[in-house]
Each structure stands twice: as C-alpha cells, then as structure tokens.
C-alpha cells in the first residue's frame, strides 16, 4: 500500500538555517550529468525538515550526516568548476535553503571566480512563493541562482519521465527572469 503521509509544511520563517544547519555536506559529486543541464559539480548539503515520503536521499535529511564543509572541499569544487567542459554548480540535499551559510559562501566564491560563465542550479522543497516570504539569507541565496527546481517531492505525483524533477508539482524556474518580472518564469529549455 502506498504511503499517504504528506511532507511537512512550514510557516514563513519558521525554519531558520541558523537554528538547524551544522554546515555538513552529505556528498560532493564532481562531473555529474544528472543534476541539471550539462556537466555539473553537485554539492549535497546535509539536513532537511520537509521529510517528504519517498525522498530519494533520505540519509541527507539528517543534519549530522556526512562531513563538515571545509575550505579544502571548497577549493576542490572551485578547481573542478574551472574545467572548461563543466557548465556549473548544483546545490541539492538535504535542503540548500536550510544550509545558507555554506551555500552562500560557495555561490559567492563561484560568482567571484567565474562571474556568470558557470551557472548555478538548486533544488528546494520550498516553493518560489514560500521563498518570497522567507528570511533574508534564503532570499540572498535565491538571488545568486540561475535555476531553481522548487517544491516538495509528492509521492502521489511521482513521474520519472519528467526532466530534472521527481514529481509533477515541481517546477524548473528561471530565477533571474522571475525576479525581474515579479512572477514565476518557467525555464525556456523545459522539455517535459
């Protein structure tokens, strides 16, 4: 029998990164082909409170999972991103928006080193609309992104044929265009 429990739904600013993040990384996968467009360097942060049934990375929900984020790891990520065939950085988890201290440090360095030559993608259980009501650190992180895949994974809407998404409620959002227009703009390369 399929599980009918739903993910947790926080009130605006109920979950603050400063109250939860231990600055742990669940995994780092350089030269990845599945976490966004092109070749990516994917950073999986530790800790998520959404607790989505059917989560593909349940171990990373634990804020203690993995290892502490270090300067050595950051330097390795930057070195890997410097390869000409790497298109960009991807933040996943866990929940990147509950790990803003680590994620902001990294995305700021990526922009300093590469400008917009490398794109930045992030997955989040938060929807765009929820992030618009969130704390300043979450909004700051959002402003560094090029693409946001938003929304909690919903087992009842699971669809493995979707491009870069696990369930049909999730959207692939063009962040700069959405911020400029004040409304959600779907990524123009969306196939399905």
Model-derived regions, located:
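Conserved Radical SAM active-site core
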Residues: 15-16, 22-26, 39, 54-122, ...
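Residues at the C-termini of beta-strands that transition into short coil/loop
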Residues: 29, 124, 152, 176
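Conserved, mostly hydrophobic/aromatic
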Residues: 43, 95, 148
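The −1 position to Zn-ligating cysteines in a subset of zinc-ribbon hairpins
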Residues: 44-47, 51-54
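P-loop/Walker A phosphate-binding loop and immediately adjacent motor/lid segment at beta-alpha junctions
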Residues: 99-111, 158-192
């Amino acid at each position: 029998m399929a599980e009918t429990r739903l993910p947790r739904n926080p009130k605006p600013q109920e979950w603050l990164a400063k109250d939860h993040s231990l600055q742990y990384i669940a995994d780092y996968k350089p030269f990845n082909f599945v976490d966004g467009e092109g070749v990516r360097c994917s950073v999986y942060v530790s800790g998520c409170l959404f607790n989505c049934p059917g989560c593909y990375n349940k171990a990373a929900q634990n804020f203690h999972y993995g290892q502490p984020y270090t300067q050595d790891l950051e330097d390795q990520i930057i070195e890997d991103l410097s390869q000409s065939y790497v298109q960009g950085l991807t933040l996943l988890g866990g929940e990147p928006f509950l790990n803003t201290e680590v994620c902001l440090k990294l995305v700021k360095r990526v922009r300093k080193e590469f400008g917009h030559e490398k794109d930045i993608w992030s997955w989040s259980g938060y929807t765009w609309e929820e992030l618009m009501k969130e704390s300043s650190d979450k909004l700051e992180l959002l402003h560094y992104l090029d693409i946001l895949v938003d929304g909690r994974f919903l087992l009842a809407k699971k669809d493995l044929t979707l491009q870069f998404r696990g369930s049909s409620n999730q959207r692939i959002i063009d962040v700069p265009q959405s911020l400029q227009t004040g409304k959600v703009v779907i990524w123009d390369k969306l196939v399905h």
